[in-house]
Amino acid sequence: MPELPEVETSRLGITPHLQGQTIKAIVVRTDKLRWPIPQELQKLVGQRVQSIRRRAKYLMIDTPEGSAIIHLGMSGSLRVLDEEVPSAKHDHVDLVLENGKVLRYNDPRKFGAWLYSEVGVAHQVLSKLGPEPLTNEFNSEYFAEKAKNKKTVVKQFIMNNAVVVGVGNIYASESLFMAQIHPKTPVGSLKASQITVLVAEIKKVLETAIKQGGTTLKDFNQVDGKPGYFAQELKVYGRAGKECPVCSSKIEEEKIGQRNSFWCGKCQFLAED
């Protein structure tokens, strides 16, 4: 599933091609992705793209008449192609530009979304979201306040979008490894020093992943079709049974909150109650 670095990589990739361009047409080849595709998207035809923003794992293409909101879901991807390139299987939406280019959305599993938002109106999917992890708003003081007296395990806590957005399964596992915190540690039991390190590692891991173009495991590729290279940097995620890069112990795996989780039992020691 594309996570924050993959979505940010997509934003950076499409921005030079869309910024300042006029939308000539929006071609929709399916009625429904995760949700029905609204007819209101057609209001954007003839409008000039003012900006491309990201909030959590949503992309927003802004025009004077409103915004297209895009979520890549489990298997969605965006490509910028010449308009004459024929559509292929699973190419569900085209944003056709007057410069002869098309932003094409492909989604084999159809768990993504294309939505519409009026100018000045916050769409309901963007409500109740926590701060962006790479902003100053997400800091150790904020984390400690949210974690106070909580028994939730730390991995589920940092993956909660109401706490902080965009820390998906891959990057949660990697950040906890770098911070030497076991993923099943009750978040309310973390020391201030551990929180400080974890917040710093979350930021560092996400920043590195964005620089590497995200992580390509199965479905994600960059806008130009190239893979994301952060997969080569993974220390624990997807490496069950392999040696820890720090201590050579075997990487362990277990489902936590229905998500596969990976850690080193030696580097990430779980204290007994």
Swiss-Prot record:
PROSITE patterns: FPG_CAT, ZF_FPG_1, ZF_FPG_2
Single GO term (MF): 8-oxo-7,8-dihydroguanine DNA N-glycosylase activity
SUPFAM superfamilies named in the record: Glucocorticoid receptor-like (DNA-binding domain), N-terminal domain of MutM-like DNA repair proteins, S13-like H2TH domain
Keyword Lyase: yes
Zinc finger (FPG-type): 235-269
Keywords of the record: DNA damage, DNA repair, DNA-binding, Glycosidase, Hydrolase, Lyase, Metal-binding, Multifunctional enzyme, Zinc, Zinc-finger
The enzyme's E.C. designation: 3.2.2.23, 4.2.99.18
One Pfam family from the record: Fapy_DNA_glyco
Active site: P2, E3, K57, R259
Free-text remark on how the cofactor is bound: Binds 1 zinc ion per subunit.
Catalytic activity: Hydrolysis of DNA containing ring-opened 7-methylguanine residues, releasing 2,6-diamino-4-hydroxy-5-(N-methyl)formamidopyrimidine; 2'-deoxyribonucleotide-(2'-deoxyribose 5'-phosphate)-2'-deoxyribonucleotide-DNA = a 3'-end 2'-deoxyribonucleotide-(2,3-dehydro-2,3-deoxyribose 5'-phosphate)-DNA + a 5'-end 5'-phospho-2'-deoxyribonucleoside-DNA + H(+)
Required co-factors: Zn(2+)
Ligand binding (DNA): H90, R109, K150
Domain of life: Bacteria
Signal peptide: none
InterPro entries linked: DNA_glyclase/AP_lyase_DNA-bd, DNA_glyclase_Znf_dom_DNA_BS, Formamido-pyr_DNA_Glyclase, FPG_cat, MutM-like_N-ter, Ribosomal_uS13-like_H2TH, Znf_DNA_glyclase/AP_lyase, Znf_FPG/IleRS
GO biological process terms held by the UniProt record: base-excision repair
Function: Involved in base excision repair of DNA damaged by oxidation or by mutagenic agents. Acts as a DNA glycosylase that recognizes and removes damaged bases. Has a preference for oxidized purines, such as 7,8-dihydro-8-oxoguanine (8-oxoG). Has AP (apurinic/apyrimidinic) lyase activity and introduces nicks in the DNA strand. Cleaves the DNA backbone by beta-delta elimination to generate a single-strand break at the site of the removed base with both 3'- and 5'-phosphates.
Oligomeric and partner information: Monomer.
Annotated family: Belongs to the FPG family.
Protein name: Formamidopyrimidine-DNA glycosylase
Annotated source species: Aliivibrio fischeri (strain MJ11) (Vibrio fischeri)
